[in-house]
Design a protein with these regions (language model features):
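Membrane-embedded transmembrane alpha-helical bundles that form the catalytic cores
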Residues: 2-229
Length: 229
């Protein structure tokens, strides 16, 4: 299994135009399903997992292993606190569980400053997953979340479009939006808005970046070297 994962290509999120072609091809069936008021839940899971796995692999599986350990850790904490909140509401228990939820990212951020090496617990997206994990613990304590199903919890954490770049979201809002399929007119408006954002992203990341980095910057760099700057 590990050899198979190592052979998977590394697909950097938003790194090149090819990535967008993969995304469009993958989400087209999802959009068609929503257009006809259908959700292909298992297909959505497979799409998210495919992009997350290829985001974290590419000859190495250390980030994928770190994600697996992270998920196990957070699941144990959430299950414990969910059960605990059914009968009690101690503030120190809440503080402790929140701190334990933050522990992986604390190690990831502190270790390089201590010994100059990257933590084995680090992976792309750990910051956003930590915001979501702690947010769920807070919502459990506040009573915003009354019933937390593990399937919904993992779907929230591993939602591919916001895995590596956000934005930060709340479980309750995310879950309500997921269960509500937009009307066709609204869906088409959302599609048009998405296309507009993608075009702006292409303009900034690929066209302007190429003009500035490949056309304008080299002559300015040479001029600075010639003048001793």
């Amino acid at each position: 299994m590990m050899d198979f994962l190592k052979q998977l290509p590394h697909i950097e999120p938003y790194g090149n135009p090819q990535y967008f072609l993969y995304v469009i091809a993958a989400i087209l069936p999802i959009f068609i399903g929503l257009f006809f008021k259908k959700r292909f839940a298992w297909y959505e899971i497979l799409v998210s997992l495919f992009f997350i796995v290829t985001m974290l692999t590419g000859g190495k599986t250390n980030q994928l292993a770190a994600l697996g350990l992270y998920l196990i850790w957070q699941i144990v904490l959430v299950l414990f606190y969910k059960q605990y909140r059914k009968g009690r509401d101690g503030k120190w228990t809440f503080y402790l569980v929140s701190l334990l939820s933050l522990l992986p990212i604390i190690f990831v951020k502190v270790q390089p400053a201590i010994n100059g090496t990257q933590s084995l617990l680090g992976f792309v997206g750990i910051s956003y997953l930590t915001f979501r994990s702690v947010g769920i613990i807070i919502e459990l304590r506040d009573g915003v979340i009354k019933d937390l199903k593990m399937w919904e919890y993992l779907r929230f954490l591993l939602f591919m479009p916001t895995f590596s770049s956000g934005p930060i979201d709340r479980f309750k809002r995310f879950n309500e939006n997921y269960k509500t399929i937009p009307e066709r007119d609204e869906l088409l408006d959302m599609l048009a808005e998405s296309v507009r954002y993608i075009m702006w992203g292409f303009l900034y990341k690929f066209i302007l970046a190429h003009i500035l980095g490949e056309i304008l910057l080299p002559p300015l760099k040479n001029l600075a070297l010639q003048t001793g700057g």
